[in-house]
Amino acid sequence: TIDVPENLEDLGLVDFKGKFTGFFSDFVAYGNLNSDVGYLSADINLKYDSRIKDYVYKGHVSSNHFDIGKIARIGDMGQVTLAADIDGKGLRFETVDARLIGNIQSLGFKNYAYSNIKVNGEIAKKLFNGKVNVQDPNLDLDFEGKINFQGKLPIFDFTAAIKRAHL
């Protein structure tokens, strides 16, 4: 038996068009998923690792207006439109340990959609460590460092060049 994380129930009604190749606990999924929280496209290998009792994954994902805030259960975060390569494990924000390299066309945060974001970093134990470049009309930023989401408020340890910030 494989337990489905509670946050995946937030997907609501799901329509997947694509193919699964492999076994129930080790497969490649490629196709498109429409759900109550948005659209995802994936070409990803997903394995259930019984030692860690979680999923291990590697591949390419893209999304269109996908409500990552609802799935990750982060109130200030909204929808994301992105294309990224990911290599990691864990499907819950609390347990994810993944490397992410991608381009984020749009990311909602505190009721504003930031655009043109490049990300290259790792997410583990509610901690982001990496580089972020933002070329948004309201934010021009080069960021390198850490953001710790473990507490009520994020804790930052970083170096940044901020050319424009109209927040």
Enumerate the predicted regions with their spans.
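Interface amphipathic segments
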Residues: T1-L167
